[in-house]
């Protein structure tokens, strides 16, 4: 896999079991959905606890360029969004899947030409599915991948479309989020292998309903693999953003691999975020996991167990789980994640390559990874401009000397300041190593 090293970060080795409380910023997935819905709303909205990361800031910049008012209200995480007539503009997607897949439907309703581009790595990410679907709904689009151009005509007909969303749930979410503003709404039917990351579609549906939009799903009497959004107003909602649970997983993994304790406050008792699945995963690997009074606490075991798990619905957790598995006793099988080959990088090949370079024993399968315990050693860990690859390297570096993570700054995609948070976690832990560590 081609990769150019940008800089090296020496992942700090834990000198003792970690013992820390880690407060996480807002969810990227919820923040960017709230921004789209606020842009389409029938009045101004306020978003509190918004994530301010590269992905979120790219979404904000794009909306501003298209004519939406987005202003900070007192602090950077509180945003006031004022809808306005959509106009032509330029959209820099960076590496953000939510930007490149959620904004084209909005752009199709602009009055003017909207040009999309992004980072070089983004030009290989699959987009043809949603762009072809939009053409079928009446949009004028040139191109099937970045860069592409949407010629907005001020409105979009909408209607019924059949797609293969087995590559990404974002194809479905992207069409649903703007569909209430389409003249006919939209009916999206999926035809293909199972859609990955279904919790993200559940998140989209829940937020649409909170905005007063009528949504019919397979779970509410609709046809199988079919989602229907009726045309109508999007109600202005004041959004309070949950912490990003997927970004919490490296810190919780730190407790698991060092036999320590990490607590994360403001953990929701009920959520559509896929990151919530880390609770059951860590428990299956031997950790003690409790959620009480909004605080999730993970206490690591003496010995971490391997795991056999289907991660199809929670694929974004794969780098964290792979790092855990590489440090566990017993073989692990991570299944149902063939779609990760189309993420920021081919995450399956990247994880196998990087763990094996450190002495690991990882084999790619058709739909996942098999990870056999092996003695790991230090070395360079490439991030492939992928934020979750970088944090996976940091996890391994907690217990393996000399792991140097390249381009750790890519974590700013969803978690700015990750390196400082990681060091703060270690510095808040006891200085005296335990004998069992």
UniProtKB/Swiss-Prot annotation:
| Subcellular locations according to the entry | Cytoplasm
The record's disulfide annotation reads none
Q: State the Gene Ontology BP annotations.
A: amino acid biosynthetic process; aromatic amino acid family biosynthetic process; chorismate biosynthetic process
Catalytic activity line of the entry: 3-phosphoshikimate + phosphoenolpyruvate = 5-O-(1-carboxyvinyl)-3-phosphoshikimate + phosphate
InterPro entries, A to Z:
Enolpyruvate_Tfrase_dom (IPR001986), Enolpyruvate_Tfrase_sf (IPR036968), EPSP_synthase (IPR006264), EPSP_synthase_CS (IPR023193), RNA3'P_cycl/enolpyr_Trfase_a/b (IPR013792)
* This protein's GO CC annotations: cytoplasm
Q: Please indicate which superkingdom the organism of origin belongs to.
A: Bacteria
Q: Which Pfam families match?
A: EPSP_synthase
What PROSITE patterns does the record point to?
A: EPSP_SYNTHASE_1, EPSP_SYNTHASE_2
Name the residues annotated as catalytic in the UniProt entry.
Answer: 316
Q: Which family does it belong to?
A: Belongs to the EPSP synthase family.
Free-text function comment from the UniProt entry: Catalyzes the transfer of the enolpyruvyl moiety of phosphoenolpyruvate (PEP) to the 5-hydroxyl of shikimate-3-phosphate (S3P) to produce enolpyruvyl shikimate-3-phosphate and inorganic phosphate.
Report quaternary structure and partners.
Answer: Monomer.
Q: What is this protein called?
A: 3-phosphoshikimate 1-carboxyvinyltransferase
